[in-house]
Amino acid sequence: MTEIRPLKKEEIPLLEEFLYQAIFIPQGLAPLSRSILKEPDLEMYIKDFGKQPDDWALVAEVDDRLVGAVWIRIMKDYSYYDDQTPSLSISFLPDFRSQGLGQQLMTAMLDLLKAKGYPSVSLSVSKDNPALRFYQRLGFVTVEEREDDYLMLCRL
């Protein structure tokens, strides 16, 4: 059974694994060392998570196991749009991708953000990431094309 629910305080350390899983590695390339998570431009996604007023996270739990997470935070990261727009990150453990859980998790997060009064949410996605079409179906539009990725925005 799948449950979409808020991340519990004691589960916050698990965001490190989900951040690692969120890093898009093009097919044929070797996985990156987990030490990359200590780089400041990645660490900012999870460091002291829950201590900022705009830190929100939801998880997908299947048979008492956390298999996916979506979280937002207002920060000047790859997905930065403006100071009122949170940046969104989402990932799943490899065995739980492409099963429709992402749709459930993202819909729940977008509904939460609407209820909290956010006008929009942003994300960045690599140009060759298959998730690009998924984000477009959810209402994200490209607001900036960069060398390797797109900055996308979903107006709520």
Where are the regions that the model predicts?
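Hydrophobic adenine-recognition pocket in adenosine-nucleotide-binding enzymes
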Residues: 7, 90-92, 125
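Short glycine/proline-centered loop/turn elements that form peptide/ligand docking sites
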Residues: 102, 106, 128-131, 148-154
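Conserved acetyl-CoA-binding loop of GNAT-fold acetyltransferases
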Residues: 136-146
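Acetyl-CoA-dependent GNAT
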Residues: 23-25, 29, 34-84, 89-93
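Conserved acetyl-CoA-binding loop-helix of GNAT-fold acetyltransferases
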Residues: 89, 98-111, 136-137
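Conserved GNAT acetyl-CoA-binding A-motif
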Residues: 113-126
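A short beta-loop-alpha structural element at the N-terminal edge
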Residues: 2-17
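Short alpha-helical
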Residues: 10, 14, 66, 129-130
